[in-house]
Regions:
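Repeat-mediated protein-protein interaction surfaces in helical alpha-solenoids
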Residues: 13-20, 183-196, 233
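Short, small/polar-rich motifs associated with maturation and membrane association
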Residues: 60-61, 117
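Terminal amphipathic helices with adjacent charged low-complexity linkers/tails
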Residues: 229-235
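Buried hydrophobic core positions in alpha-solenoid tandem helical repeats
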Residues: 17-18, 57, 107, 111, ...
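Helix-turn-helix repeat elements of alpha-solenoid scaffolds
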Residues: 7-12, 183-186, 220, 309-311, ...
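Nucleic acid-processing catalytic cores of prokaryotic defense/repair systems
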Residues: 65-67
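An alpha-helical repeat/solenoid feature that recognizes helix-turn-helix modules
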Residues: 1-5, 22-52, 69-98, 117-181, ...
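Short, conserved phosphate-binding/catalytic loop or strand-edge motifs used
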Residues: 105-110, 270, 293-294, 316-322
Length: 503
């Protein structure tokens, strides 16, 4: 294995970070929590199975009446609020008190007054599936909503699933299982039951699993929900669990970008190596099918830590013009293709290698926004997509990186941060720093003052709560992944400052 540079001590923060992995630290999801709040106790149909979920919902409602993100990201607010409204409408009569009534009234007001822009902003995974299902549920409860505003979304759903034979939903591990709730009353319960993961979930989705439990009883699925609630302790559910492959791979990737390859990572690396198959690897060893993004980043991490790799696990995801993250997806992912390109540049030679690299480079070139930055389907901020595109293109297409460096420099805020949604965040600042530190030496040398402001900002804000910016069925924040990006940026900045001082 590659040694850790002797002149770079391993910070205590990194040791603590590695020790905390595989615990599933992730932000709460009002969308999934609301599905669980609808479940009734097995021995009392007038009592909630998990009353703590209602408490969480009432505590987490935003000041504008919405649920979900507090950022101006309309789709997350919409599906989270509709999910909460259905849960509030389904409460037993004994719980229809003043607090629940006020929450429902303000949420209804939000949907009427503040969702005119619902088609703008980042998309969510499965949005065109789950929104029509939520609207159907709201209509069945006669909730007074502006249904005409959302005309057309059902056609999008039908366009996505119309060509898929229904039997495939239950016979293969497609991404549709992760959004099983889109089936509404059309679910085949026994066919679905056969697709339960060994961990008791449907594709590691609490909301899909709770949806199933609303229609039938299943001890294994119920224990999956109960275990998550016990482990979290605040009455909330996340949008995905478990996700340990994703967490380990992204954390080790961020550390490696800062030159950190600690010996303490070896058990985690062995876990990744054992999980990787000829068909790739997914977010977790169980529950979700392999995908190109987790496969590519796992390969990249293993290579960076000295493990032999090949391009074989990426072959199932190759398309005509780019690499697919999942089957059936509508749009390609910039970051997934960037991660694939990183791997293609370091694996042993194989037939068509150069042609495939050029295909991915062309896709990334064509995917630029305004010729100087990128956006991605798996993260709400363009600073993530741009950073990861730059990481891949620096060696193979540096001409595409120069405009991105200029865009990044010009996007910094006065307080030293970067942020896309109204204010800066430590996470987005970390990505901007990581990307800028791959620039030519003369570019970095000319940024002494901006980088010093970025370092000061990160030092002041590193303990702030993680703001969910990652995109699943709702926005989420993988705590340790974000922490690792910030640590990586801080190490890079400290090393750069040390180098300047030595000069």
């Amino acid at each position: 294995m590659l040694p850790r540079p002797a002149d770079v001590p391993l910070p205590a923060a990194i040791k603590g970070l590695l020790a905390s992995l595989q615990q599933g630290a992730i932000s709460a999801a009002a969308y999934d929590t609301a599905f669980t709040a609808r479940l009734r106790a097995a021995d009392d149909p007038n009592a909630l199975a998990y009353p703590q979920t209602l408490g969480f919902l009432l505590r987490s409602q935003n000041a504008d009446g919405s649920f979900g993100t507090a950022l101006p990201i309309p789709k997350d607010k919409l599906v989270s609020t509709l999910s909460a409204l259905v849960a509030l409408a389904d409460l037993p009569q004994s719980l229809q008190d003043g607090a629940a009534h006020r929450a429902r009234a303000t949420a209804l007001r939000f949907v009427y007054e503040d969702t005119g822009n619902w088609q703008t902003g980042p998309d969510l995974a499965g949005f065109e599936l789950v929104l029509p299902a939520l609207l159907d549920e709201a209509r069945a409860r006669e909730l007074p909503l502006p249904y005409e505003r959302f005309m057309g979304i059902s056609a999008q759903r039908d366009a996505k699933i119309g060509h898929i034979p229904p039997r495939l939903i239950y016979n293969v591990a497609t991404p549709l299982l992760h959004s099983l709730e889109y089936l509404g009353n059309r679910i085949d319960l026994e066919a679905a039951r056969a697709q339960l993961s060994p961990n008791g979930s449907f594709a590691n989705s609490p909301s899909a699993t709770a949806y199933f439990l609303l229609r039938t009883r299943d001890e294994q699925a119920n224990e999956y929900i109960a275990m998550l609630l016990r482990n979290r302790g605040d009455g909330s559910l996340p949008t995905v669990a478990p996700f340990e492959i994703f967490e380990i791979a992204w954390v080790l990737y961020n550390l490696a970008r800062a030159g950190q390859r600690p010996a303490e990572a070896q058990p985690l690396l062995r876990y990744l190596a054992q999980a990787l198959t000829d068909d790739g690897v997914g977010v977790s060893r169980e529950g979700l099918r392999p995908d190109a993004d987790d496969t590519a980043l796992t390969l990249s991490v293993l290579h960076r830590y000295g493990y032999p790799i090949s391009a074989g696990p990426l072959r199932p995801f190759e398309g005509v013009s780019f690499f697919f993250t999942f089957p059936l997806e509508r749009d390609a992912s910039v970051s997934a293709n960037a991660h694939v390109l990183e791997v293609l540049q370091v694996v042993p030679p194989f037939p068509r290698q150069h042609l495939i690299q050029q295909k991915v480079i062309k896709y990334l070139r064509d995917a630029r926004v305004d010729g100087d930055h990128w956006v991605d389907k798996w993260h709400g901020s363009p600073f993530y997509a741009t950073a990861h595109a730059v990481f891949a293109l620096t060696a193979s297409a540096p001409d595409l990186c120069r405009p991105a460096f200029t865009w990044l420099k010009n996007s910094q805020r006065e307080d030293g941060s970067w942020g896309w949604f109204g204010k800066g965040t430590p996470e987005e600042t970390a990505y901007a720093v990581q990307a800028l530190m791959t620039a030519p030496a003369e570019t970095i040398a000319a940024m002494t003052e901006p980088l010093a402001r970025a370092a000061a900002y990160l030092n002041e804000t590193e303990a702030e709560p993680v703001i969910p910016l990652w995109v699943g069925k709702t926005l989420y924040g993988p705590t340790q992944v974000v922490r690792s990006a910030v640590l990586s940026a801080q190490i890079l900045l400290a090393r750069s400052e040390h180098a300047r001082s030595a000069d």
